[in-house]
Amino acid sequence: MADQWGERMPRSVSLLQTVAVSVGVAIGSGIFRVPATVAAQLHAPGPIIACWVLGGIIALCGALTVAELAAALPRSGGIFAWLLESYGPLPAFLFGWTELIVIRAAALGAIATIFAEYLGYFVPLSAVQVRYTAALAIVLIGAINYLGVQRAAALLSATTALKYLVLAALGLLAFTATGGSGAHFSPAWPAGVPLSLLASALIPVLWTYDGWADPATMAGEVSDPQRTLAPALIAGALCVMLVYLVVNIGFMYALAPAQMAGSQLIASTVAARIPLLGGAGPAVVAAAVMVSAFSGLNASMMTGSRVFYAMADRGLFFHAAARVSPRFNSPAVAIWLATALGVAYVLENDFAQLADKFILGIWPFYALAVAGVFVLRRRRPELPRPYRVWGYPLVPAVFLLASVLMVLNALFTDPRNTGVTLLIIVAGTPVYWLRAQHARRR
């Protein structure tokens, strides 16, 4: 039986589990890889730290804003539900279409790839074997999620707490036990670092922060959602920003920017310099990264499958994707669909391609969702709002400005990939109209 918001699955996800979704999605794998990527692009400590601070501020502005939408419209699908309410079915369908074709599959593939790469520390794997191992990890996570949200959420809470503590400890030990140097922080900001380069480096940074809106995709399963969702979204963004700054400053104290840039498995490189861990440092960190990536993979599967479920439940996707397992109360078809897409992507793309596709696909819709706060305040003033955006209208305006600048920068610096991603989004329009005509004929 559906509840007052039209949701059919049990509301059993707690506040702490909702925060774990946000933190679990963000701290999946990128933080163990992206610091080296950013250092290779920016080369200097000032721009590197500024990039991580700016990414955290942008993510926090987004979380502060969409928390209002999540509390007012606690429905499965998150951004999909907000776009449907703010702009109607076409923009909502285009988000779901892009989530289906690009966003979720790329996210699952990127996280699973890092899991498999770090497994290679213990078991030598060829490039092809890394891809097959990543595909198997996605299938295993799909099976766990099929068995029910409580099993998946319990696993997520435990692994998220573990990886957060390990990551914070690694950052702090990098300051105190690596024999690093404060000289790595100077010169802080050399002349000749263009702002466009900083904007380009923001793309992988924002991928590591992504997760601040994901708990809302499960709004239909969150208990007491009008009280739970807003604090969970904000707390998740703050927790991630704090630990990322500790880790990056710690890494830079242990390694000069040039050394960071040359270390693909940077967390293991730093751990090798911590005498407290002995010779086991890299192995300990490699295991922690695998746990972290597995946790992030679980969180991404939990949230992404709910978008497909919500689309189908509202008549904008194949009806079969709205089926709920009578035994496990999970959106079974949507979960296996996400699993199949993730496997297909991981077998055809490398990590950098996957991360870039995810960011370029999601950010136009983040901007639309945040703009929906302005739209709904004007069009639906009577809508109950248990939480209102702190710093309105400045906070959502800052996020919108950052989103527009980032998409424009991507168009100028990487026109091919950006153009392809935007074409994929637009290509959903004729698909929407064909489906709408088919529905009318029925």
Language-model-derived ranges and their functions:
Residues 37-40, 60-138, 142-146, 151, ...:
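Hydrophobic transmembrane alpha-helices that form the core helical bundles
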Residues 1-36, 40-46, 59-60, 64, ...:
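Membrane-interface "cap" regions at the ends of multi-pass membrane proteins
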Residues 155, 320-330, 366-417, 438-441:
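C-terminal membrane-solvent junction of multi-pass transporters and transport-like membrane proteins
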Residues 2-5, 42-49, 64-93, 115-123, ...:
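Flexible loop linkers connecting adjacent transmembrane helices
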Residues 12-22, 88-100, 133-137, 192-205, ...:
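Select transmembrane alpha-helical segments in multipass membrane proteins
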